[in-house]
From Swiss-Prot:
Cellular component per GO, a single term: plasma membrane-derived thylakoid membrane
Cited Pfam families: PSII_Ycf12
Oligomer and partners: PSII is composed of 1 copy each of membrane proteins PsbA, PsbB, PsbC, PsbD, PsbE, PsbF, PsbH, PsbI, PsbJ, PsbK, PsbL, PsbM, PsbT, PsbX, PsbY, PsbZ, Psb30/Ycf12, peripheral proteins PsbO, CyanoQ (PsbQ), PsbU, PsbV and a large number of cofactors. It forms dimeric complexes.
An annotated GO BP: photosynthesis
Gene: psb30
Name of the protein described by the UniProt record: Photosystem II reaction center protein Psb30
Keyword Cell division appears in the UniProt entry: no
InterPro entries: PSII_Ycf12_core-subunit (IPR010284)
Record-annotated membrane-spanning stretches: 12-32
Subcellular location: Cellular thylakoid membrane
Length: 39
């Protein structure tokens, strides 16, 4: 637990959250286009 406590988790969570948004955006658009939905 000492190693985890030494790391600053806030920037890691922020980078992970931004990464998920950047990945989820194109995925949602691809799924809508794959289903033939009009944007």
């Amino acid at each position: 637990m000492e190693l985890l406590a030494a790391l600053n988790l806030e920037p890691i969570f922020q980078l992970t959250f931004v990464g998920l948004i950047m990945v989820a955006g194109p995925v949602v658009i691809f799924l809508l286009a794959f289903r033939g939905g009009d944007l």
